[in-house]
A protein has these predicted regions:
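Non-catalytic, polymerase-adjacent accessory regions of viral genome-replication enzymes
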Residues: 1-53
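Conserved polymerase palm-domain catalytic core
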Residues: 108-183
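N-terminal low-complexity, intrinsically disordered segments
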Residues: 17, 82-83, 87, 132-135
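Active-site-proximal segment of RNA-dependent polymerases
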Residues: 71-122, 167
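Short, conserved non-catalytic motifs in the polymerase core
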Residues: 37-76, 93-95, 151-171
């Protein structure tokens, strides 16, 4: 499933795989010493967990946000920009995709007999380190590079809500699932 290499991840077209960590660092304009400091998944990388109150269906619930510290956030923004430039998401992906929004998504479904909509509880925390790593290797990254990206973008073994890279990586992880759902 995740190990399939869909056409959208054509390695030759993307200039992948990046086989060396140094290649990734050059692409995101960082040096190894800087990255190595942020590579290990520790509590020290994150600001204090912030509960965020959101209204959903007339009720208030909380979401725990785990934003990275300022330096890690800069690195993640560079990684996010790099991933967005290298890996095209499927045309049906709308969640936090540039130039797409709920209105455009609704237009795509106008006139359809059935539309399935769901909200996954604890969505980002439900996406594990292993699934992020598998999606990146499936997209053509070498194990070393996929491991580094995964370690820099996950927190306590999952995607954190509040990181610049989480939405793109969630879209990447679920692109195979989404593709199977599209009729």
């Amino acid at each position: 499933m995740l190990h399939q290499k869909p056409d959208i991840f054509c390695k030759i077209e993307l200039g992948l795989p990046l086989s060396k960590v140094q290649d990734l660092l050059a692409e995101i304009d960082a040096n190894y010493g800087e990255i190595i400091k942020y590579k290990i998944d520790t509590d020290g990388q994150r600001k204090r967990n912030k509960p965020k109150y959101v209204e959903k269906l007339g009720e208030f619930c909380t979401r725990v946000i785990n934003p990275p510290n300022d330096r890690l956030k800069q690195i993640q923004k560079r990684i996010n920009k790099y991933l967005n430039a290298k890996i095209p998401l499927p045309k049906y992906a709308f969640g936090a995709v540039k130039n797409k929004d709920n209105v455009k998504n609704a237009r795509e479904h106008k006139g359809q007999k059935y539309v399935f909509q769901t909200d996954i509880r604890d969505f980002f925390p439900s996406i594990s380190y292993k699934r992020v790593y598998a999606a990146l290797t499936s997209a053509g990254f070498s194990p070393d590079v996929a491991s580094l990206i995964t370690r820099l973008t996950t927190y306590k073994g999952h995607l954190p809500q509040g990181a610049p890279t989480s939405t793109f990586l969630a879209n990447l992880v679920f692109s195979t699932t989404d593709r199977k759902s599209v009729v």
